[in-house]
Amino acid sequence: MDYLPIFMKIEQQHCLIVGGGTVAARKADLFIKSGAIVTVVAPKLGNEMTFHLAQGKIIWHMNTFSTALVSELPRPSLVISATDDQNVNLAVYKTYHAQDIPVNVADQTEYCDFILPAIVDRSPMTIAISTGGRSPVLARVMKARLETMIPHGFSVLTDLVGRYRQTVKNVISDIDGRKTFWETLLSGLFIDKAVHGNTGEAEALLEAELETIKNNGQSLPQGEVYIIGAGPGDPDLMTFKGLRLLQQADVILYDRLVAPEILEMGRREAERIYVGKKEKWHKMDQKDINQMLVDLARQGKRVARLKGGDPYIFGRGAEEVELLVQHDVPYQVVPGITAAAGCSVYADFPLTHRDYAQSVALITGHQQAGAQGIDYARLAQSGDTMVFYMGIKNAPKIQAGLIAHGLCPDTPAAIIENGTRLNQKVTVTSLAKLSETIQKKSIKPPALLVIGEVIKVRERLQKKSLLDDRVPA
């Protein structure tokens, strides 16, 4: 390592900033947030530094830095020079470096005893990223990625854990025991309660665990289930929360609509169980899947149930949750981008457009025996954009039903195969030719049927879409 990563406590310590511009103001802001007494030496101040002065957060010496000025300034713990004058910057470095006071000259690593990293601030948690001064831009790129991955609620979580640290130490005397306790707690429901502001519930979980340890001498493993919407196929469309929960799961249950790349995002050591279904062939009955979730959670395991699209849109997620509730199994449901939303965008047309459609109907094309049939009369007269899930097999019935109830046979229809994936294929036809097109092109599931005038917009949008370089039309 070129630099030792270290966090310094500078509260109520004097720190010196030489320079009054934008860069200097941003450095001063870090000192201010850390509670330092900040002195600024500059002949004039920019807008940001003037704001700090107006807030009473800095002490300003309206001078150009010189060695003669040093005796008038309090001895600083840290010094940053951020001016456009290289002679001034060099003078600052030589003056304070000779006194064994750490100095940083902005953008000149050869004159830096310390460097300031890119920071992800979740105070009291702080994450620092450094490239050793080689590429501040790369450090900022990494910071941006971490900002999206780490919820702001981690500040609440960190504070909560800190408040209970001594309490846990009083109950669990050995270090290994405390380590196990915190590792278990911080990979389960507790962390999500705290991060999302449910501190009361988080504290109740923590205290219940401690009470169990007091009474039994050990904490009983408590499993939980995550019903995660994996989105329509493209791994980049997975939500951050879904990814975070997937990566802490001990067991992953998945179906055929989940992309292999998404499955690979789970922990390498996690057990993977395929529970997918195909028409006329079911790997596992839905009731058995529901019970498996309960059984695995009762073994103390964290179970991720990955479902294509969104769990509550033709995903039978509610059936799984009902049984979890009946058995008092803790669970979370993570929404996913449903196929209708994702596939239409990747096929270069919207689902609504004020010139064509003001509403959308999501319809299952696979009807359960005994279920109420599709209301073709309402759909044909509604003006909705119609999206049929699992509708390939029943396309002839869908086509006939809509035409019989008055929908124009020339209404555009789109068939999206493997939507949002690299092998996506979009076929545009008319309602009158829908079944013929599916048969002629040997189209197989997974595929989405979209019927509506809004598909006409595709020709205009497709000309400039960056997605055209990613997926074939």
UniProtKB/Swiss-Prot annotation:
* Region entry Uroporphyrinogen-III C-methyltransferase, spans: 223-473
Source organism (scientific name): Hydrogenovibrio crunogenus (strain DSM 25203 / XCL-2) (Thiomicrospira crunogena)
Q: Which CDD domains match?
A: SUMT (cd11642)
Region named Precorrin-2 dehydrogenase /sirohydrochlorin ferrochelatase: 1-206
Q: Which Pfam families match?
A: CysG_dimeriser, NAD_binding_7, Sirohm_synth_M, TP_methylase
The record's comment on protein family reads: In the N-terminal section; belongs to the precorrin-2 dehydrogenase / sirohydrochlorin ferrochelatase family.
Keyword tags? Cobalamin biosynthesis, Lyase, Methyltransferase, Multifunctional enzyme, NAD, Oxidoreductase, Porphyrin biosynthesis, S-adenosyl-L-methionine, Transferase
Q: What is this protein called?
A: Siroheme synthase
Q: What is its EC number?
A: 2.1.1.107, 1.3.1.76, 4.99.1.4
- PROSITE patterns with a match to the protein in the record: SUMT_2
- Entries under InterPro entries matching the protein: 4pyrrol_Mease, 4pyrrol_Methylase_sf, 4pyrrole_Mease_sub1, 4pyrrole_Mease_sub2, CobA/CysG_C, NAD(P)-bd_dom_sf, Siro_Cobalamin_biosynth, Sirohaem_synt_dimer_dom_sf
Name the active site residues. Answer: 255 (proton acceptor), 277 (proton donor)
The record describes the protein's role as:
Then it catalyzes the NAD-dependent ring dehydrogenation of precorrin-2 to yield sirohydrochlorin. Finally, it catalyzes the ferrochelation of sirohydrochlorin to yield siroheme.
Residues reported to bind S-adenosyl-L-methionine: 232, 308-310, 313, 338-339, 390, 419
Where would you find the membrane-spanning parts of this chain? none
Tell me the residue numbers annotated for binding NAD(+). 22-23, 43-44
Q: Name one GO biological process term.
A: cobalamin biosynthetic process
Would you say which domain of life the source belongs to? Bacteria
Pathway in which this enzyme or protein is active? Cofactor biosynthesis; adenosylcobalamin biosynthesis; precorrin-2 from uroporphyrinogen III: step 1/1; Cofactor biosynthesis; adenosylcobalamin biosynthesis; sirohydrochlorin from precorrin-2: step 1/1; Porphyrin-containing compound metabolism; siroheme biosynthesis; precorrin-2 from uroporphyrinogen III: step 1/1; Porphyrin-containing compound metabolism; siroheme biosynthesis; siroheme from sirohydrochlorin: step 1/1
Q: Name one GO molecular function term.
A: sirohydrochlorin ferrochelatase activity
The catalytic activity, as recorded, is: uroporphyrinogen III + 2 S-adenosyl-L-methionine = precorrin-2 + 2 S-adenosyl-L-homocysteine + H(+); precorrin-2 + NAD(+) = sirohydrochlorin + NADH + 2 H(+); siroheme + 2 H(+) = sirohydrochlorin + Fe(2+)
